[in-house]
């Protein structure tokens, strides 16, 4: 993605979207939307192309799988502590785990990669269904907050915050943060999100967990 001449990035309610254009595909445009799968570990992509020639070809691959056993990844991948992580990119000599070609033509296509019970990355066959299921789950989560102000940015930011609070839920407790500092801190302010967004059963579950551990 980083090699395209024009890159527009958008984030809203737990999903990313990129609009890409390049001199090598004059008049062509590629839009990629990525969101988490509704269950398990994985990602679902919707790839839409327009203005491409019949001879244009779109290929993909997943590579660079790394296993970190017994390590806390939210600390290892903390860019404030390890700024060199910002220079990471694609390395051509990395092993391709899975890959393929997409159908030629200006159509919307779907791709889903999930980790199976052994941690192996596999390509799912029912990609469109998986994508729509993941999208519906995000809409349900973020739809817990109804907001309508004159500021569209505030509206988008507020609804996105619901997904962030959901990301701090590590049953049976809320953790400090979704990525960095995602450690369980009793009484930390992330529990306020569970209260404000109506996850009262989660708040009660956390309370019971800590109260039961009191001596």
Task: Give the ranges of each region predicted by the language model.
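Secondary-structure transition/capping motifs at alpha-helix termini
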Residues: 24-27, 50-55, 197-202, 213-215
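Substrate-binding groove/exosite segments of carbohydrate-active enzymes
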Residues: 139-215
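Extended, loop-rich substrate-binding clefts of extracytoplasmic carbohydrate-active enzymes
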Residues: 2-39, 159, 163
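Short glycine/proline/serine/threonine-rich loop/turn segments at secondary-structure transition edges
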Residues: 119-123
């Amino acid at each position: 993605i980083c090699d395209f001449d024009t890159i527009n990035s958008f984030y809203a309610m737990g999903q990313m979207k990129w609009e890409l254009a390049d001199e090598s595909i004059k008049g062509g445009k590629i839009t990629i939307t990525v969101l988490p799968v509704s269950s398990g570990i994985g990602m679902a992509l919707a790839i839409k192309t327009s203005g491409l020639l019949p001879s244009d070809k779109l290929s993909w691959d997943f590579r660079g799988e790394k296993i970190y056993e017994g390590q806390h990844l939210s600390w290892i991948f903390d860019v404030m502590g390890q700024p060199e992580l910002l220079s990471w990119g694609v390395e051509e000599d990395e092993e391709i785990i899975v890959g393929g070609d997409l159908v030629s033509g200006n159509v919307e296509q779907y791709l889903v990669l999930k980790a199976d019970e052994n941690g192996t990355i596999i390509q799912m066959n029912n990609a469109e269904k998986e994508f729509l299921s993941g999208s519906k789950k995000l809409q349900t989560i973020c739809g817990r907050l109804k907001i309508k102000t004159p500021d569209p940015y505030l509206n988008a930011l507020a609804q996105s915050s619901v997904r962030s609070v959901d990301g701090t839920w590590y049953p049976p407790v809320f953790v400090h943060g979704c990525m960095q500092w995602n450690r369980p801190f009793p009484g930390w302010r992330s529990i306020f999100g569970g209260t404000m967004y109506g996850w009262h059963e989660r708040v009660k579950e956390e309370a019971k967990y800590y109260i039961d551990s009191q001596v």
